[in-house]
Amino acid sequence: MSISHRLFKHGMVLLAATFIVVGCAMVPTDDIKISSESDPKANLKGYKTYNWAGSAALVYDPAGQWEPPEIDLDSEFRFLIDREMRAKGFTQSAANPDLLVGYVAGIDMDSIEYKKNPESKIKVLQNVPKGALVVVLIDTDTLFPVWAGEALAEVQKNITAESTKGRLDYAVSKMFAEMPR
C-alpha cells in the first residue's frame, strides 16, 4: 500500500471521527447532572461477570412529545449499559454472575422550579419536567448494592430520536466514567 493511499485512508478515518465528535457535541447536555456512589468496602476489581436483574421505565406519554415513538428506551438503556459494562472489563454471564445489573428510569411531569424569564430577568415558577435514570450493581452473594449511578435532567420537549440517543449516551457514559474499577 502506498504512503499516499495510507495517508488518505487515515485522513478519512480522522475526518469521520471529527464528524462524530462534533455531532455529539451539538446535543445539549448542560442540564444533565451525574452522580454515583460505591460501597467503600466493595472491591469492584474483584467482580468479573454480570447479568440483568430487571428494569423499569416509568414514562406515560401517549402524545409522544417527551419520548420519541421511534425509540425503544428499554433496548437503548440496555445497549448503553452493556457497552459500558464491557468497556469496564465485565462479561455478561447468565450462569452464576458476580453482579446483577438493574436500572429504573422515570419522568416527573409535575416538577416545578424557578426559571429566569429572559425578557424581564425575573424568576418565575415554571413546569420543568425532570427525567432520571438510576443504574445499580448488586453483589449476587450478599444481594447488597456495590455501586449506583444516577443521571438527572430536564426532559426536552419534541426532541429528535438522534438527540435523545445522544443525551442518553452522554448520561450513561459519564455515569460509568465515575465508577472506580
Predicted features by range, described:
Residues S2-L14:
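Bacterial N-terminal signal peptides that target proteins for export
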Residues C24-F79, R181:
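A structural "domain/chain start" motif
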Residues A25-K45, V128-A132, D139-R181:
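C-terminal/domain-edge helix-coil "capping" segments
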Residues V27, K88, A95-V146, E150-N158:
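Surface-exposed short loop/turn segments
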Residues K33-S38, D82-K88, P118-I122:
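N-terminal post-signal-peptidase region of extra-cytosolic proteins
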Residues A63-D72, G89-F90, Q156-E162:
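Second-shell loop/turn segments in exported
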Residues S75, F79, R83, A87, ...:
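Solvent-exposed, polar/charged alpha-helical surfaces in well-ordered, non-transmembrane soluble domains
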